[in-house]
């Protein structure tokens, strides 16, 4: 089926919503040149962050389209962007301050030599991870480089790093946050460590 949409981007967006799970072919004109581009469609609403884990003062989640685009962290990767100051995970030194907050851009690979690729892995291994006071975390840092200390971000860092974390008994009781689509609020559920 061929549809000519012209420059109406709202109509283009609606048509894309009607064809989830298929590949479409776009003809785009740029600088007087005709370009052909194939695009796989999917429901972007199914990739929104709907679940997070708060553990050791850090908020863990799987990157969605928006965060992946802004940070460079791969889509669906286990990530950390926010850590409470003074908490166990605040000993990771790779952060910057923005609007009086500590901001991180980390992709988490391992804790205590246990491979982690998603939130389910983290929940599964938390009982083992929390048994000791000292753990090592392996991660990739995606912090931006600020030219002249301004806000023109360029993702320049993709360093694999490790950090030693001292788990503080105050903030090691992990809990799961699930987005409730009915109340539009985050429901909290404690994670059992036994």
UniProtKB/Swiss-Prot annotation:
Domain of life: Bacteria
Protein name per its UniProtKB record: Uncharacterized protein RP187
